[in-house]
Amino acid sequence: MQDRFTRRGIMATAGAFALAAPVRAADKEPVFDDSEPTRGVAIPSVQHTDEMAAAPLIKKKVNKLWNDAPTIKEPNALQFTPTGTLLILDQVDPNKVFEVNPSDGKILRTVQTESIHGSGITIDGGGNWIITSTKALQGPPVTLVVDPKSGKTLQKWVTPGWGFYGPDRPPRPGMPPETPSGGHDVKWAGNGRYWMAVPASGRIFLMDEASGKAVRSLVAPVNRTHGLAIDGNFLWSVAADFYQIHKLDPKTGKIIAKIQLDKKSDPAIHGLEIRDGVLWYCDAGSGWVCNLT
């Protein structure tokens, strides 16, 4: 196992980025120092707020398919395999990956990993898993390449833009200190690259797996981008706090359309995946796995 890198620049300084208005993908990429957390990125921007309001609404029905609790306690990410089974990342630490039959949720196998508070899983071009850890026992949060049979970490690197998302929050008496956040969902894009949402940075990164560096990034539409899914020429992203799923142009990050769920009756949206044009999602809070039709 090796650390691919500990410091690199992919975006201007973290402090400058925190004060600057979000830019589109075509603008100059800011730079993050991996040794220091990002703080206080103010999103969503007025531009994205207007886009969310104006985006056409795609009406979908939420189907609650199955719930494997208490075995799978906190399903936080989904990934279909080439054989049609479904991988579920449980964020209970240290994280386990469950391979299940998507038709009924029957657990086919379980793999223990070294991930901590994982929030994203995908399969790379060589069949290994890429898992994002939103937290860390020590040091900054990392992204892992994992052996799908043993669960052992093959490689790891510091997640770009890790830190504290949303506005700065002063310490509250009697409350534990705020912990930094790393990557949320991750999805393989082909050609050695994958998309990764990092809420603290206010960005969705297109990453190069071989170098562990960002190729480019999109300004995230919201403060807490969670799940991701790739559908042909479009990228879907979860706006968890809004109970929305956004259809994005992966070249510009523009919101093309949105799906609105009901906060009162529908399970919350965390992990996201798509299969045969149907979006699937999971809720780490209630344990439900759902799809949208």
Model-derived segments and their meaning:
Residues 70-82, 114-125, 161-189, 221-232, ...:
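Beta-rich, blade/repeat-based domains predominating
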Residues 62-68, 106-111, 152-157, 166-176, ...:
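A short beta-strand motif characteristic of beta-propeller blades
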Residues 88-92, 131-139, 196-200, 237-242, ...:
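Conserved beta-strand positions in repeat-built beta-propeller and related beta-rich domains
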Residues 101-104, 147-150, 208-212, 249-253, ...:
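Short loop/turn segments that connect beta-strands within beta-propeller blades
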Residues 273-293:
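Blade-level signature of beta-propeller repeat domains, shared across WD40, Kelch, NHL, RCC1
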Residues 96, 138-142, 246, 288-291:
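Structural motif
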Residues 1-17:
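N-terminal secretory signal peptides and thylakoid transit peptides that target proteins
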Residues 47-71:
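A short helix->beta-strand "capping" segment at the edge of beta-propeller domains
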